[in-house]
A protein has these predicted regions:
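Periplasmic solute-binding protein
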Residues: 1-30, 50-71, 153-162, 234-243
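Short helix-initiation/N-cap motifs at beta->coil->alpha
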Residues: 29-31, 99-113
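Glycine-centered hinge/linker elements that transmit conformational signals in sensory
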Residues: 35-36, 72-101, 131
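Short, solvent-exposed loop/beta-turn-alpha elements that line the ligand-binding surface or hinge
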Residues: 66-86, 142-152
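Paired acidic/hydrophobic, glycine-rich loop segments that form the ligand-binding mouth/hinge
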Residues: 117-122, 136-138
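C-terminal lobe and pocket-closing loops
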Residues: 127-134, 144-237
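Conserved C-terminal helix/tail region of periplasmic/extracytoplasmic solute-binding proteins
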Residues: 220-290
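A structural signal for multi-pass alpha-helical bundles of membrane permease subunits
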Residues: 312-601
Length: 601
């Protein structure tokens, strides 16, 4: 084979078993499930794992004779074997063998509380469990349905050297030492890593590490993960197929056909190479025009006099200009330049405006079809309008309430209501995602208390969108509240008193006096809040994750997927970013003119 680096650790999944619930080893998964049902408490599960993740589904797929990608890196998650594996996992969910909407934190909680007899997880869980529970680790068993073993995917951590580093003997020597038996023993004993040295595991010093040895045994029969780009591009469509089947939205065969179509679309050949001559000519013409205008200005005596008079002022702003150039202008220029290229970072190909044409023509498909720029733009606009409406409405009401001088504990309320804004957005997003979990989330628990039915919040666009909005409104209303409270302090009391003397009711005073005086402050805050919300990546990515099937993705999260989950198409993602910038710049300019016109009137 081809040597990419020096391997230092293996990673794969294995079976963690609660010894109090399943004291004996079972040859098949079905036997383990039957044994676990006899002892698990009511509401518990025989097995827990991240069923909607293709990495954790791979052992089931291999047991049915299927593969995620073939030896050439082509998407192979199709056919009868793949469909049978999806149907099998769906049956596990239907028969309450596994929980709904699982994740790593939920698996750990269920296992440690004795509500899950077994979990499928990687070695990291051993460090989290400690001695709080009696458990053992086993290689994954066979499936009685097929008689074949559940072989996990095997990944390898390795030491790599750059081209310059590989030419230095000391770098090669260090890499070899890190992969040696001596260093491997240290990583096993101190780092609890599964080193890829079978002979090392025969050392008597490691005989007591039974759980770690089980991972080493599992790694020996695991399926090595393909190092091709096709493998990287397979995760997203495979995950979506799993989620559709588990939700019951599609039959396995239809979900797999759609997954293959999306993989083909994401990995289709890049646009043909374009000539850079038009770009060079355009940049040259722009440079000449700029130089010509600069020469004309420099030859003007009045301009030279103004420059000499302003030199001291320029000295004060030079550092700020340099910072803006380094942190704003140059990154924007680099992003715009990247959008004109395709291919990998090591072998870029100039394609001109092909990325923009592909985005704006929906890659040759329906302009409002799944994942198109225009459909995602509509979702983004809806997302922005709804959020800003609630931000302003709630912020205005709370700001007015907290500005009443006779309100008791006013300072305490202000601090408490500002806290959602002070907490990092990703922390809040993860907390809200947990609250929207179908089986164990606080929101559904409240619905049950009120006599309602639990809701699968991320199974439909309306509920997933509502979950995202609720999270972002919680994050955003304190900003508007603070703006309103600050603006209210600038309203002269004598104006309000004069309106009251004239017989204006409380509603009339708010509508005809307070609100018009708040508008000059509120409108810029609304524009700023709209820009923030338009690009609110954390909430969309961490709460709904774009579910269901990417329908709640906004433009910035769609750009992220093209950059990092769809074959690393950085040029395509950069074109998305440029279009987002142009939309925001145009919108800000439009509203800026409106603000200027209203201020003048």
């Amino acid at each position: 084979g081809v040597r990419y680096g020096v391997p230092v650790a293996n990673k794969c999944v294995a079976l963690y078993v609660n010894e109090d619930l399943v004291p004996s080893v079972h040859a098949t998964l079905e036997e383990l499930v039957r044994a676990a049902r006899e002892k698990i408490p009511q509401g518990g599960f025989p097995l827990a794992y991240t069923a909607d993740n293709a990495y954790f589904h791979a052992p089931f797929l291999h047991a049915f004779g299927g593969r995620l990608v073939d030896d050439t890196g082509t998407f192979a998650f199709v056919g009868d074997e793949a469909a049978a594996s999806l149907a099998f996992v769906r049956s596990l969910l239907v028969h309450h063998v596994i929980p709904e909407e699982p994740n790593g934190a939920l698996e750990k909680q269920l296992f440690m509380s004795g509500r899950a007899a077994a979990v499928i997880e990687s070695p990291w869980l051993m460090g989290e469990l400690g001695t709080s529970i009696r458990y053992r680790v086993e290689p994954l068993p066979k499936l009685a349905a097929t008689g074949l073993p559940m072989r996990p995917l095997l990944t390898v951590e390795a030491v790599f050297a750059t081209k310059a580093g590989a030419a230095r003997p000391i770098a090669r020597e260090l890499a070899r030492w890190l992969g040696s038996a001596e260093a491997g023993m240290t990583r096993v004993l101190d780092g609890q890593q599964v080193v890829p040295r079978p002979a090392l595991w025969k050392d008597p010093a490691l005989s007591g590490l039974t759980n770690l040895r089980a991972f080493a045994t599992a790694a020996e029969s695991a399926e090595p993960m393909s190092p091709t780009s096709g493998m990287q591009a397979a995760w997203e469509p495979a995950n979506q197929a799993l989620k559709k089947v588990l939700r019951g939205d599609q039959e396995p065969e239809a979900a797999l056909v759609e997954a293959k179509r999306r993989w083909d679309d994401n990995t289709r050949p890049p646009p043909p190479k374009a000539s850079p001559t038009p770009l060079i000519a355009l940049l040259g013409a722009a440079s000449l025009a700029f130089a010509f205008m600069l020469v004309l200005r420099v030859r003007d005596p009045a301009f030279r006099h103004e420059v000499r008079a302003s030199l001291p002022a320029y000295a004060y702003v030079t550092h700020a200009v340099l910072v803006v150039l380094a942190l704003v202008v140059f990154p924007l220029a680099a992003g715009a330049l990247t959008s004109l290229f395709s291919g990998t970072r090591d072998a870029p190909r100039y394609v001109g405006l092909a990325n923009y044409v592909s985005i704006l023509t929906a890659r040759g498909g329906d302009l409002l079809g799944h994942g198109s720029f225009y459909l995602t733009l509509l979702v983004t606009v809806l997302w922005t309008v709804v959020n800003v409406f609630f931000h302003v409405s709630i912020g205005l009401v709370l700001g007015l309430a907290l500005s009443r001088p006779l309100l008791r504990l006013r300072a305490v309320y202000r601090v408490l209501l500002i806290l959602p804004w002070a907490v990092p957005s990703y922390v809040t997003a993860l907390a809200w995602k947990g609250m929207f979990q179908r089986q164990f989330g606080a929101v559904n628990a409240l619905l049950r208390m009120l006599g309602g039915e639990p809701v699968s919040w991320f199974s439909h666009f309306s509920t997933a969108f509502a979950a995202n909005v609720a999270t972002n409104v919680w994050l955003g209303f304190p900003f508007m509240m603070v703006v309103v409270m600050g603006a209210l302090t600038s309203i002269p009391k004598d104006v309000l008193e004069a309106a009251e003397v004239d017989g204006a009711t409380r509603g009339q005073r708010f509508r005809l006096v307070t609100l018009p005086l708040l508008k000059p402050v509120l409108l810029p805050a609304v524009v700023l809040g709209a820009v923030w919300t338009f690009n609110m990546f954390n909430v969309v990515f961490l709460v709904s994750g774009g579910e269901p099937d990417g329908t709640t993705d906004i433009l910035v999260s769609e750009a992220y997927r093209w950059a990092f989950t769809r074959d690393n198409q950085y040029g395509y993602a950069a074109a998305y970013a440029v279009l987002i910038f142009l939309l925001l710049a145009g919108g800000s300019r439009f509203f800026g003119r409106k603000l200027t016109a209203e201020g003048a009137s």
